[in-house]
């Protein structure tokens, strides 16, 4: 008996053809006018007042958190340097521990030889 396993090679799937927007038809701006332009408040109502009480409460919470300082920015800086568990090799201190390049380091004897020529 021979074992017939499933092949690991998969044929590429045919791509579905989608017509470009020019072929479908022009977009009508009046369909999206509510989404594109924000609703303008009436003259009697202030622009910052929300009609939804839950949304108004969220707005107050945002104002309170804004006075606490730049905590999100400080947190984003910490994410810039991921911790790998072995911090001793990472960072600028690890670069100073490398041995100097012998081509860049000149001994006093080499300096004297060049000055004599």
Curated annotation (Swiss-Prot):
Highest taxon in the source lineage: Eukaryota
UniProt feature, compositional bias: Acidic residues: 32-45, 87-96
InterPro entries, alphabetized: GAGE, GAGE_fam
Biased composition (Basic and acidic residues): 103-117
Coiled coil region boundaries: none
Pfam family, one: GAGE
Region (Disordered) residue spans: 1-117
Family: Belongs to the GAGE family.
Remarks, miscellaneous: This gene belongs to a multigene family expressed in a large variety of tumors whereas in normal tissues, expression is restricted to germ cells. These genes organized in clustered repeats, have a high degree of predicted sequence identity, but differ by scattered single nucleotide substitution. Their sequences contain either the antigenic peptide YYWPRPRRY or YRPRPRRY which is recognized by cytotoxic T-cells.
The protein's name in its UniProt record: G antigen 12B/C/D/E
Natural source organism: Homo sapiens (Human)
Gene (UniProt): GAGE12B
């Amino acid at each position: 008996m021979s074992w017939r396993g499933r092949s690991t090679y998969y044929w590429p799937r045919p791509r579905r053809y989608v017509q470009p927007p020019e072929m479908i038809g022009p977009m009508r701006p009046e369909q999206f006018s509510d989404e594109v332009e924000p609703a303008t408040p009436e003259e009697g109502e202030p622009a910052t007042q929300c009609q939804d009480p839950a949304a108004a409460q969220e707005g107050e919470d945002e104002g309170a958190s804004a006075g606490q300082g730049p905590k999100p920015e400080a947190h984003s800086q910490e994410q810039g340097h991921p911790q790998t568990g072995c911090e001793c090799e990472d960072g600028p201190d690890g670069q100073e521990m490398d041995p100097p390049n012998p081509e860049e380091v000149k001994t006093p004897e080499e300096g004297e030889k060049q000055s004599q020529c």
